[in-house]
Amino acid sequence: MLNVHYFFDPMCGWCYGASSLVGVLADIPEFEIIYHPGGMIPKQAIDPSFRQHILQADAQIANMTKAHFGDAYKARVTGTEDYIVDSYSTTRAFLVGQEMGIEAHVMLAAIQKAHYQDGQHLDELNVLADLAVSMGLDKATWNEKMADSEAKMRSQVQESHDLMGQLQVSGYPTFILEKEDRLMRLPHSNYYGKTEEWKNYLAEWV
């Protein structure tokens, strides 16, 4: 079994662009993904002047990765209402989803779709609860676990930051392969939008 350390954030656009690469990696039984959430954006309203930059970056991501950004999401970014982004609540949901039996890559992809395609307000805990229910999870259990998830989330984010410092990781997404006591950064950006080539590349390590 080969470990791949994945440094990411649920609200990172390039991580959304890399979601198909994560899916390929998760489907190869010889690899185990170790997820390191980064807590990129504490809950905050994005300044209107920065929204145009987001749209430009999204266009670049879509062009390079073939990821789809939905109309509902774009309407939120360009709208007159506050556009609130929260890495912490979505990371809590990511962790609780796994605790309740959802595979990590499936939970992450569902959160990313809800944000980047469906334009849902994932800073609101009731919206995250509805997402959990749509994935077959019990709402009462979900709410109970979410209420207790803050400390674990902050601990995981701090561990991620510590490891990022040790490994000189400066951004998301980053994939680092651990093999025979060696750590190697995988050139994932060479394979954006090229899942078959990515699969063939990964097979060389097995």
List each model region and its residues.
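C-terminal cap of thioredoxin/glutaredoxin-like
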Residues: 11, 19-25, 113-206
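Extreme N-terminal starter segment of soluble prokaryotic enzymes
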Residues: 1-5
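Short metal-coordination and nucleic-acid-contact micro-motifs, chiefly zinc-binding Cys/His arrays
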Residues: 8
